[in-house]
């Protein structure tokens, strides 16, 4: 783990998938952990290969995509990448099904899981995003209707699945 004190403005823009790539600014600073200091995991410059059940064979080099992986931000919050990887590992998840927008982060989660002790990664399937309009994805965090609400409205499980498949363009 690498403590860091870099601000987002110190990070160069990396033009692959519009991600920011950490340049290693704090790698050699010997910062102590504490308030206002985030944590990163130093990723190895290895190629992560996996087969996505929809997209087929994939190869990603996380250290080139994002640099050292942020796992806890300066406010002390664990990142999605870290929390999802730990949850999947602890719960013994063997199949991760999620949107295409997360395909590019799969290699870093596989490498992080291996660093945490997971011998075999789960299988992955990345599906088209479910859109409520041509430019906006469906999102419960934006107040869009969830499965519970659809079931409360009387839709059967089959109707909910049919609706989701239709919205996903399948």
What are these regions (language model features)?
Residues 158-170:
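Generic C-terminus detector
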